[in-house]
Amino acid sequence: PEELIVVGSGVTGAEFAGAYQALGSKVTLVSSRDRVLPGEDPDAAAVLEDVFRRRGMNVMARSRAQSAKRVGDRVEVTLSDGRVITGSHCLMAVGAIPNTECMGLEEAGVRLRESGHIWTDKVSRTTAPGVYAAGDVTGVFALASVAAMQGRIAMYHFLGDAVAPLNLKTVSSNVFTDP
């Protein structure tokens, strides 16, 4: 895209903003937080934000997007303070909510957290006998590698094998940006 507005400065937002900037797009990164990558190491995040700015990215800290709409062949993003920014495209990277409503999970005995995530123990069991859950819907480290491990643990546990509980202290993650 010619001019990309990325709403959200977490890992996904930072990765896409950096990638599209490297491909030649003019990028505006809208962050509701004080800095990019708010959940990551502050020193590393500061370096990344500095590089983004030096490369020409418009990083808008403490700016919350209120709405986005198509206007002709453009996109308008209205911020909560009334400012409006425009671009050719907009990418929303503001997180996800689990799709667990109206599925009858609670009626089946599956306990949900207030956030809508499915409660599981360390071997992926839910509160309903014989029902397991794995992946982002559990609200545990939204990483593909963690989801795959949760799934393997659930399968082996269900089959009666001895399993080691998921140990989140040993999970590593990457942020795919340059730098």
Kindly give the residue locations of the regions a language model identified:
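Rossmann-like dinucleotide-binding cores of NAD(P)H-dependent redox enzymes
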Residues: 2-5, 11-76, 80-81, 141-148, ...
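FAD-site-proximal beta/loop scaffold in flavoenzymes
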Residues: 1, 85-162
